[in-house]
């Protein structure tokens, strides 16, 4: 399909809303050879965009499980990655991404229960700051780029082990050279959870 598209005059391409597979973006990049390509990330609560990553198709493309990096925060925004005990993780360690800054919402209108679940006050750089809990599993690499591993609610626990369904999907796609894959948990007749994979 991409072979039929030629958009040499396009100057900018911004990817948003969903995690972007590197192999698909490489193909798309051939259709827009003169465009700068950016991957933007952000939940609605952060007024949609809070981080960005400029993709260099002629260089190394940062990714996690085949999905593009979400980059670094825009000016005026802060991101932190915390563990289950609300401690900042070391670079290279996975945790939940939190965002803060002027464009992050003050909260949900007249919904204190939801606000209590979605926001935390955190001592960051000497200031107690309000952060939004994204629910996204990420890590920060040595270059301060944020790598996205999927939703925490897409992570499952089976027999005491945390399993990232997105990682299973990535390896399935990689084994056949692309395409789609979906991993999910189902209950067997004996009521024990098992993982199924369709690709």
Give the location of each predicted region:
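Gly/Ser/Thr-rich phosphate-binding loop
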Residues: 1-69, 78
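AMP-dependent adenylate-forming
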Residues: 33-39, 54-199
């Amino acid at each position: 399909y991409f072979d039929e598209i030629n958009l040499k005059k396009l100057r900018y391409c911004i990817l948003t809303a969903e995690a972007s597979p590197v192999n698909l973006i490489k193909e798309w990049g051939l259709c827009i050879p003169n465009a700068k390509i950016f991957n933007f990330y952000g939940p609605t609560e952060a007024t949609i965009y809070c981080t960005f990553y400029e993709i260099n198709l002629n260089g190394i493309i940062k990714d996690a499980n085949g999905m593009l990096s979400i980059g670094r925060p825009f000016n005026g925004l802060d991101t932190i990655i915390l563990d289950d005990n609300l401690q900042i993780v070391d670079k290279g360690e996975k945790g939940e991404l939190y965002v803060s800054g002027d464009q992050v919402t003050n909260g949900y209108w007249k919904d204190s229960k939801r606000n209590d679940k979605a926001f935390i006050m955190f001592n960051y750089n000497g200031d107690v700051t309000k952060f939004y809990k994204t629910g996204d599993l990420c890590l920060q690499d040595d270059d301060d780029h944020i790598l996205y591993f999927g939703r925490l609610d897409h992570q499952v626990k089976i027999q005491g082990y945390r399993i990232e369904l997105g990682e299973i999907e990535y390896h399935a796609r990689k084994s056949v050279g692309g395409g789609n894959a979906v991993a999910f948990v189902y209950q067997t007749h004996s009521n024990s959870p098992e993982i199924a994979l369709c690709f």
